[in-house]
């Protein structure tokens, strides 16, 4: 098609499909311009729902244009084609955090989980310092290099500009399993504190290999979240500072959760 022809003219070679959604797909690619493997996300605006095409996508594009951080997936180029297709050229990753956790069962708390989590916290702090929020933090949105050492945050489809309280959000974003009580209850929420909660879920998943809260019955999740987090039986005890950090991130009341800047200063994370 016209878009793929244009990509060839621009020096890109498309490979196999890495993933597919209802109105987008991600393909492996290489280029004469950039070193290393690339991924190209192809978005078909004409097949996308209006809320996505006119609200979430423009936000995502305006945000990814202005962020550069070693722990955030780099976007090299945005190519608009008159047939309604958009090509987002970005760095490719070998795997993601969810795949790594599934492969290993769980991650050793120190140094593996701690090192990866510290990098993700650094990326989220970079965003929050610029009044940007992610709103879809989960293990599958943390990409990893082949050696598993460098983490890169991806997928800014629900991100937006958000100043802190009283600028509250109302859109339910992300996955229920990573959603905070206030988001699940439909209460206008401080999106930065929602990101902090999701970080808590992510750290729990990394070190236990399980979800902290069962999301089969979403309506009753906030009651379970209020009781606090439990650990699977038979799991060797986690380091006390790691458990304490998870408990802080998963505090029921958003106001009592730390900011991501405070999390970044956590002595256990700094090793």
Regions found by a protein language model. Name each.
Residues 15-21, 26:
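Protein kinase glycine-rich loop
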Residues 25-30, 34-46:
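Glycine-rich ATP phosphate-binding loop
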Residues 43-67:
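Conserved N-lobe beta3->alphaC-helix segment of eukaryotic protein kinase catalytic domains
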Residues 77-79:
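A short, aromatic-enriched beta-strand patch in the conserved N-lobe beta-sheet
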Residues 83-96:
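Conserved short submotifs of the Hanks-type protein kinase catalytic core
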Residues 116-117:
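Activation segment signature within eukaryotic-like protein kinase domains
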Residues 128-144:
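Catalytic-loop of the protein kinase fold
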